[in-house]
């Protein structure tokens, strides 16, 4: 499925992420979250939930009859004058694109944002064949200009300041921008955008080939749909004489009615907009009478492991994804460790459930555990992908050894987990444990936080504080109101039992963390 075969070391990769990146990530995703909440509220919650259910139904039905829709799509594209190519895996997809480019003597390529191109590692193959590939998405263009000087975690360029981008443009493009490296205020975004636009327009006009993706493919008409905000995708698709479109087979939509539903959902959750700046419909190459569009259009339909998921309920529900990335924006894990930690082109919750199924659990067995199971991704997903259900399903397979990497679990961990389950399943023990923890935490308490616990918990609090343990809110409320509805306080014997349980759990947890620290657990 991919040239990558080494197991993904999520823990090791995330440990390398600089602390300042997390704050920048949260700030960037919070802005999108606020916009999303506003447009969804304006849509109306009841109507929104109905639209989500409709979107899910469209995606599930499409996947159940995917072969029929793809056959219809191929016939429609061919009838419109386009060429359809089928790629079983990443290697065959790269070969197809290289053969098309070489047959047309291509030396310069302009590329819009395409996760599929990254998935099949196409850019490196094109460069190895002597072709120049220019990223035209503004963020990707900045990252490409910076090259190896940019920390690998800063992808895309959302975490770079305006001043950093201005300095980069001065050095790489040789342009004069008002103000020096220490100028305050930094150059306006419009100034930087105009500089990039000037360079990119010249590249569009000189390019031999445009390389794009597509958000959807309408089977009944053979129409390719591209949803963007920058307009670079439209330029890549209309100015060069040759266009190659890379699309996973799962992005097909049966008809225009289904597309209308999905276009209602996608921009609202992806960018917090009712509709993006550009929605482009591509229907075959240009006719002789048209003044724009490619003279030749090639569509590469890529499987790369997706078809094997169709026979499994969890696989189909995963493939419902319409690639909005809303799950990334709300995920506390992604916002802390960034995308590079996931070790694959698709990070965040969707990467955590898709990579193990596409790449195999032997490669991505760590990713199902890269989640707090908070469920925020479930709530925000426009097509109601059940992330936590799929994550738990994949975790059970890893524990059962289906991926060839069953984790080594020490008896101490088993004992600690068993004791924790007993406490959490008993109201009496839980209340007693909470009261015990509230007392035991006193030496390390600073306000509402535990900022510096002793080993082995010191490893956790060295990175982030823990909230203090408090007794149940309802019990405290009734105590203040002198309400006896909760019954008599715990007996001394029960309190003693609860304290003992709490101490056993704490001891088990400490031993488990100690084992992990020594690399045993």
Predicted segments, located by residue:
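The feature marks the mature, well-folded catalytic cores of soluble enzymes
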Residues: 1-314
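A glycine-rich phosphate-binding loop feature that marks nucleotide/adenosyl-phosphate handling sites
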Residues: 92, 276-289, 323, 334-338, ...
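Short, contiguous, pocket-lining structural segments
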Residues: 251, 319-323
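Short coil/turn segments at secondary-structure boundaries
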Residues: 275-278, 409-415, 448-453
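Ferredoxin-type iron-sulfur electron-transfer modules in oxidoreductases and energy-metabolism complexes
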Residues: 289-318, 328-329, 333-446, 485-486
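Hydrophobic alpha-helical topogenic segments used for membrane insertion/localization
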Residues: 419-423, 432, 490-517
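Short linear elements at protein peripheries
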Residues: 437-500
